[in-house]
A protein has these predicted regions:
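Short, Lys/Arg-enriched, Trp-marked, Pro/Gly-tolerant hinge/linker segments that flank
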Residues: 104-117, 130-141, 150-180, 184, ...
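Basic/polar phosphate-binding segments, predominantly the helix-turn-helix DNA-binding elements
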Residues: 183, 189-227, 239, 245-274
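Generic protein-terminus/edge-of-domain signal
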Residues: 1-60, 67, 73-75, 94-102, ...
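A hydrophobic/aromatic-rich effector-binding and dimerization subdomain
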Residues: 1-20, 65-132, 149-161
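Generic structural signal for alpha-helix termini and adjacent loop/cap motifs
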Residues: 42, 129-132, 155, 185, ...
């Protein structure tokens, strides 16, 4: 079986994917799942509210559930992806809610380095198994999923307090409401007061809350989301740039040019030429 862009559901809900992309850009988002990304070739930049990682071949990152993150690859990559939903994590270990996962891509700690290597080896075994024609492939994939989950809990998880759990879940519910509102209305002229109203907060309090919990301002998040939609249409359609900008609510052309150059290190016209 060909490896290219294989996607499999494991044990019902977990998702494995072998992916080859020429370039990609996904704005700030989160999953109701723990996510592992293992770069086999190429590069990928991962940004969270706390840090920015430039991943290259052989590096692997673990992103905890509900952690806002963005990914961008300017030159493409080949990667293995595994997403384990929190519901499934809870089935394996009921105390999931009271634990968090700590994974340092650039660690020099020998114990953590060895543990990361073991996880990477299991992911490579998943790749080999997923591309096989064995009638027992699904059994082996489920077995590897359990082994990886065990390693994640045993080597990378630590307990959190009840107070931290309460604050985290309350903030997650609030952010979910804001993100849902933004995705539904981003084409419109959204004011800070509009977004703040979704949480019944004063705009100043809302700005502090959003920045503290995402690492970016709300307006930056909104425009990054618009930029991702513009980028998607730019590389998949022949529509004129001004039509795409109007479609996705990007009315400030100067800001768009600045953000596009900062994010992609090129111009919209050059990007389209490179894709032809």
């Amino acid at each position: 079986m060909d490896d290219q862009n294989i996607r499999l559901n494991i044990a019902g809900h977990a998702r494995y994917e072998y992916s080859e992309v020429a370039r990609s850009y996904v704005p700030m988002h989160w999953h109701d799942a723990l996510e592992l990304i293992y770069i086999l070739s190429g590069e990928l930049t991962v940004e969270t509210e706390q840090r920015r990682w430039q991943l290259h071949a052989g590096q692997c990152i673990c992103i905890s559930p509900y952690v806002l993150h963005a990914t961008i690859s300017l030159f493409g990559n080949t990667a293995l992806l595994l997403q384990i939903p929190t519901e499934e994590l809870g089935d394996f270990a009921p105390e999931t809610r009271s634990r968090q996962f700590i994974w340092d891509v650039e660690t020099t700690n020998p114990t953590m380095t060895a543990a990361i290597e073991r996880v990477k080896q299991k992911l490579l075994q998943m790749q080999h198994t997923a591309s096989s024609d064995s009638p027992f492939r699904d059994i082996r994939m489920a077995s590897l999923l359990l082994e990886i989950t065990y390693l994640l809990y045993e080597e990378f998880s630590c307990p959190v307090t009840e107070g931290s759990i309460f604050r985290r879940e309350k903030n997650r519910q609030r952010l979910s409401a804001v993100i849902a509102y933004t995705e539904a209305h981003y084409r419109e002229n959204i004011a800070l007061s509009d977004a703040a109203a979704t949480l019944h907060m004063h705009p100043n309090s809302f700005c502090r809350f959003f920045k503290e919990n995402t690492g970016v301002t709300y307006l930056n998040y909104l425009n990054e989301y618009r930029l991702s939609k513009v980028h998607e249409d730019l590389v998949t359609t022949d529509a004129a740039l001004h039509e795409i900008l109007e479609k996705h609510g990007f009315t400030n052309y100067k800001l768009f040019r600045h953000m596009f150059a900062e994010r992609f290190h090129t111009t919209p016209g050059r990007m389209r030429e490179e894709l032809r």
